[in-house]
A protein has these predicted regions:
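Hydrophobic, well-ordered secondary-structure elements that form the walls
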Residues: 51, 104, 132
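Zn-dependent metallopeptidase/amidohydrolase metal-coordination segment
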Residues: 116-172
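Midchain, well-structured core segments that form catalytic/ion-binding scaffolds
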Residues: 1-95, 123-127
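Alpha-helix C-cap/termination motif
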Residues: 21, 78, 110-111, 135
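C-terminal helix-coil-helix/basic helical segment that borders enzyme active sites and/or dimer interfaces
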Residues: 81-84, 109-123
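Short, low-order "capping/linker" segments at domain edges
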Residues: 94-111
């Protein structure tokens, strides 16, 4: 029979060999692989996998998805297996409105003073909270960052921050 683990490894290698424009921030990574034949001496004939595909720009995400699909088709032929996939979810890039960013800048100055205004940054990747502009293209949106002494890091199980900083966001 065919070993599903071989196909998973080939998918991983295919992702590692995807090369996009180096000026574009993007990534495609396997985040979950499950292949279980039921016993240690049974080669698994089926597997499931999940991946995280993200980029700074939504058009780059779409291009990555197209290249990944092309890779799946090639691997399907190479291993003579059926690789089925669905893009169940996506992680969009930020669509920042200059008008909304200017309003946020003025609000920060008004609420907190000029010393609290930092230069705008371009986020290097996509995130789930950018859905509002992809689902409502007419919506003008921006993001603000509030220093809140977050530690030890975002998504860490023991993440904590200064909750008093939330009032700054309310004021802005």
């Amino acid at each position: 029979g065919k070993n599903a683990i071989d196909v998973l490894v080939a998918i991983q290698q295919m992702l590692q060999n995807l090369h996009m424009d180096p000026a574009e921030v993007c990534s495609a990574k396997l985040t979950k692989m499950v292949a279980d034949g039921g016993s240690i001496n049974i080669i698994p004939g089926k597997a499931t996998f999940s991946m995280d595909v993200r980029a700074q720009k939504n058009e780059v995400v779409r291009e990555l998805q197209q290249r990944i699909e092309k890779g799946f088709n090639h691997l399907s032929q190479m291993f003579d297996v059926d690789i089925r996939w669905d893009w169940l979810d996506s992680t969009p890039g930020a669509e920042v409105s200059e008008e909304a960013a200017k309003i946020a800048e003025l609000s920060i100055i008004e609420a907190c003073g000029m010393d609290y205004l930092a230069p705008a940054v371009v986020t290097p990747g996509s995130d789930d909270f950018h859905f509002y502009t992809t689902k409502q293209p007419d919506l003008k949106a921006t993001m603000i960052g509030i220093g809140a002494d977050l530690a030890p890091g975002l998504h860490h199980p023991k993440m904590a921050f200064n909750k008093e900083a939330l009032q700054i966001g309310v004021d802005v």
